[in-house]
């Protein structure tokens, strides 16, 4: 039984996924490195629950693949290819670019949990259904509302 109630994870650090938090250059040769924050689980034996804990790893980024905020895959490197003792990994590839979220199933771009093409469609429908009746003068609210409902029903029938 350990002295603490927290067990460290048994998952190795050979390959990890995390976000780039800092990019810098080290040494006289100005080797580009990235600080990658990876989450690992720790098990609390008293609560019988896993808790996520963040760890920072320095990784070589020789080809300057990532920018701050990108989600990257890092692999552990052997001691002979390390420029410094605290640089233990190398950036393998960029998994997700920051700000460029694409649904992996459909391949469509996403903004705040909504597909980009659906946002464009809503914008067009609002212009056709809501804004055009408001441009007409001398109509009462009820008449404008009835015209908006008719146009919305016409759009529904046209798209079905």
Curated annotation (Swiss-Prot):
One of its GO terms (biological process) is mitochondrial translation. The keyword Cytoplasm does not apply. Its main location: mitochondrion. It comes from the Eukaryota. The keyword Translocase does not apply. Signal peptide: none annotated. It is found in: Mitochondrion. One of its GO terms (cellular component) is mitochondrial small ribosomal subunit. GO terms for molecular function: RNA binding; structural constituent of ribosome. InterPro entries: NA-bd_OB-fold, Ribosomal_uS17m_metazoa. Keywords: Mitochondrion, Ribonucleoprotein, Ribosomal protein, RNA-binding. PANTHER family: 28S RIBOSOMAL PROTEIN S17, MITOCHONDRIAL (PTHR24088), SMALL RIBOSOMAL SUBUNIT PROTEIN US17M (PTHR24088:SF0). Component of the mitochondrial ribosome small subunit (28S) which comprises a 12S rRNA and about 30 distinct proteins. Belongs to the universal ribosomal protein uS17 family. This is Small ribosomal subunit protein uS17m. It comes from Caenorhabditis elegans. The lineage of its organism: Eukaryota, Metazoa, Ecdysozoa, Nematoda, Chromadorea. The gene is mrps-17.
């Amino acid at each position: 039984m350990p002295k603490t109630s927290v067990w460290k994870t048994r998952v190795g650090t050979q390959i990890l996924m995390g976000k780039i938090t800092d990019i810098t250059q080290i040494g006289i040769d100005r080797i580009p490195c990235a600080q990658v924050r990876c989450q690992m689980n720790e098990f609390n034996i008293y609560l019988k629950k896993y808790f996520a804990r963040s760890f920072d790893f320095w990784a070589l980024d020789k080809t300057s693949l990532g920018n701050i905020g990108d989600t990257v895959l890092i692999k552990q490197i052997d001691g002979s290819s390390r420029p410094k003792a605290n640089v233990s990994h190398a950036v393998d590839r960029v998994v997700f670019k920051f700000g460029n979220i694409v649904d992996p199933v459909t391949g469509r771009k996403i903004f705040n949990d909504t597909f980009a093409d659906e946002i464009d469609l809503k914008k067009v429908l609002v212009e056709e259904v809501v804004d055009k009746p408001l441009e007409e003068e001398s109509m009462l609210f009820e008449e404008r509302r009835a015209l908006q409902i008719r146009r919305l029903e016409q759009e529904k029938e046209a798209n079905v």
